[in-house]
Every structure is written in C-alpha cells, then in structure tokens.
Amino acid sequence: MTGTVSRRKKIAMIGSGMIGGTMGYLCVLRELADVVLFDVVTGMPEGKALDDSQATSIADTNVSVTSANQYEKIAGSDVVIITAGLTKVPGKSDKEWSRNDLLPFNAKIIREVAQGVKKYCPLAFVIVVTNPLDCMVKCFHEASGLPKNMVCGMANVLDSARFRRFIADQLEISPRDIQATVIGTHGDHMLPLARYVTVSGFPLREFIKKGKMTEAKLAEIVERTKKAGGEIVRLLGQGSAYYAPALSAITMAQAFLKDEKRVLPCSVYCQGEYGLHDMFIGLPAVIGGGGIEQVIELELTHEEQECFRKSVDDVVELNKSLAALG
C-alpha cells in the first residue's frame, strides 16, 4: 500500500550569528522544522550548523541542520528569518550611534537578501529582525515583491516579553500570567500599553489599588522597557541580546507553521488601520497559516495616540531616508 509522504517543513536563517545560531538550536529542541543556516561569512554557518546538529542526539529530536553560503540552498523554505546586517556602525563607539544609523548599511544587505528569497522561496513567510526594524521590513517587502501578509518584522514580541518580565518581577509572580503588549517602533518611541496590562485576566490597576505596585514604579518599568536592549548592551560590553530575540522570532515562525492563530505584536503592513497607509509598524496581529491574517485595532487614549504618533513619525522619516537611497 502506498501513501503520500508529507514534506518536512524548512526554515532558513539568513544570518548565522548569535541570534541565527540560537534560533537553529531552538528548532532542534522543539523539532519545529529542518534548518538551513545561511551566511556570507565562510565557516560561521558550517560551525553553527554542526553544533546545532549534534545537539539533536542529546535532545532526541530528528531535525536536519545544514549550512549554506549560496542562496540556492534555501530553496523551498517555508519560513525565512533574516538577522543579516550590521549591529553597530563601523568606527563609532556604542554611545555615538543608534539603530537608525544602521539604515544605509543594512538596506543594501536586505535588498540582496530579498532577491535571493524572491528567486528561491517566494512562498515563504518572512520575518525580518534586522534594524532599523520597521524600515527594513518595508525595504525587504519592496525589493522582494512578496505579498504583504507574508512579510513582517520581529521586535514587539521581544519588547512585550521584556515588559511582562519587569512587571512580573515587581509583583513577584510568574510572567506567564502577565498579559502586556508594546506597539509602535522598536526604539525610544515604542509604546508599552500599560493601560491594557492584565494579570491572569485581572486589570493591573486592581493590583495597583491594593498597593502591590505604585503608578511611579509602573512608569519606571515603561521607561526601562524602552531602554531594555541598551541595558543588555551596556552590561555585556560587547554584542547585544540574542536568547530572547531568537525565541521571539521562533515563536512567530511556529505560529505560522502550526497555524496557531496567535495574537502577537509585530511589524505589519498598514492598510488603513490606525489611520496609517503604506508603512510597516509594530501592531498586534494574528499569525497563522495564512501569515499575517488580521491586524487588531485598539482604542487609544489621547495621550497614547500622541506617543504612538511619535513612533509613526520616526518610521516615516526613516522611510524617507530609505527612498532617498534609491
């Protein structure tokens, strides 16, 4: 008796640095999909792939982890996660640059990646991680021509996770019981939605009323969330966060591969939502087998709208700079 053999799922990691290698490892642990680690740096993807592959024996999972320096190896990938690009401006100290300064360097890289994805896996769900995030998602989308619902960016899942962790630590409870969302751009003008935070379904404001947290402490947590990436950079002295960013991207990939219909905040294309058009920015969205299946619109107060507008203005200016590059 013969039957149809289902094809194994495949994820391509474009960029095999700390985030890329960690994402490969997470795929091994979760037995999520076969992995291709791609990088233009010879030796890096080969070494990371070998290390991740050997971990399958210990994890008792059956995942193929291979390496590539040529785009044809990513052919047929169901998901592509892009971390390729510079993480700091050459010749400048950590105090002399911001994520936005990476634009001219990383736009060129993203456009090259877009051509490879367009040629070899045009049906893939693409998650961009490269900074400046929202602008780089737009850059990839325009260069690749992939459908809007199949292109998004990872930042807000990470920002929201940090927000949840800080609140959980203050309340001395598990972060799994904290529901909190950060929208807007991945930078100083991100908007942690403190008003919408719940604890196992109960409004955080009820805990504040009972003295479990003060309004001042909540405001402090909001500001810490905005600076959380920089806090890690300063503590490390070299490099930046990679465990939480990697898990954030894999969570999004899993939602697509398993059609989980997860509500996850991420950089998505706006078609009138929040009064925005033709731009990518961080908003809560439903991720399932159809990619970005729905963008969720929340009611914002006047103050929240003003904060969100600052995020929008940041992205608009970056998009103008992107267009000026030609």
Swiss-Prot record:
This is L-lactate dehydrogenase. Pfam families: Ldh_1_C (PF02866), Ldh_1_N (PF00056). It catalyses: (S)-lactate + NAD(+) = pyruvate + NADH + H(+). Keywords: NAD, Oxidoreductase. It is an enzyme of class 1 (oxidoreductase). Gene3D superfamilies: Lactate dehydrogenase/glycoside hydrolase, family 4, C-terminal (3.90.110.10), NAD(P)-binding Rossmann-like Domain (3.40.50.720). Homotetramer. The keyword NAD applies. Belongs to the LDH/MDH superfamily. LDH family. One of its GO terms (biological process) is lactate metabolic process. GO terms for molecular function: L-lactate dehydrogenase activity. Disulfide bonds: none annotated. Pathway: Fermentation; pyruvate fermentation to lactate; (S)-lactate from pyruvate: step 1/1. NAD(+) binds at residues 39-60, 131. It comes from the Eukaryota. Substrate binds at R99, N131, R162. Its EC number is 1.1.1.27. The active site is at H186. Coiled coil: none annotated.
